[in-house]
């Protein structure tokens, strides 16, 4: 038997619903979603609700909570222990970031403010965050942005780096780039 995991903020994404409708009955669907009464949740054999609350403009809260739920699911599927102390610390860090309570936030805003384009670079497990951040720049800040894998950036767009070029690098703690 196969498992497909579908992640959606609204649970009504056309592409996701059409995919599920075409799946054979021997494929198990697990959904990660913010809306308990959505079509996605109804079509799924199992569902994990993020409970991120109502989104005001962009799906920032849902993205963060879906990421957390997916991480917990991956840990469970791999029979990994979940350290509740570390998990609570991470939740507090995320809460502070969402509320703008981080010492580096104002400096980052100052550096990015007025830019005409932002390049976001990530690899591995943090590439999803880079992609979502590019979307947020375009939706919320009305600033053109693009997310690229580190290797993609190194073999092409690196040539466009010049004075005033803004790039944000996402590096996970196991990455050589992190150091």
Task: Please give the residue ranges for each predicted region.
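Anionic-ligand anchoring segments at beta-strand to alpha-helix junctions in alpha/beta enzyme folds, i.e.
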Residues: 1-4, 115-163
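Short, structured loop/turn "capping" segments at alpha-beta junctions
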Residues: 80-87, 101-105, 143-144
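Amphipathic coiled-coil/heptad-repeat helices and related helical stalk/stem segments
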Residues: 16, 104-105, 153, 179
């Amino acid at each position: 038997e196969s498992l497909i995991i579908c992640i959606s903020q609204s649970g009504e994404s056309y592409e996701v619903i059409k995919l599920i409708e075409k799946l054979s009955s021997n494929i198990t669907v697990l959904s990660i979603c913010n809306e308990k009464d959505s079509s996605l949740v109804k079509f799924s054999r199992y569902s994990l609700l993020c409970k991120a609350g109502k989104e005001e403009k962009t799906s920032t809260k849902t993205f963060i909570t879906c990421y957390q739920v997916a991480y917990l699911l991956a840990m469970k599927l791999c029979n990994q222990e979940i350290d509740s102390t570390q998990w609570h610390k991470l939740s507090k860090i995320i809460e502070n970031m969402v509320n703008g309570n981080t010492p580096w936030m104002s400096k980052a805003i100052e550096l990015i403010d007025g830019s005409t384009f932002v390049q976001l670079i990530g690899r591995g497990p943090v590439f999803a965050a880079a992609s979502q951040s590019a979307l947020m720049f375009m939706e919320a800040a009305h600033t053109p942005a693009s997310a690229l894998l580190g290797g993609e950036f190194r073999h092409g767009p690196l040539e466009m780096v010049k004075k005033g070029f803004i790039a944000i690098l996402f590096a996970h703690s196991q990455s050589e780039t992190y150091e």
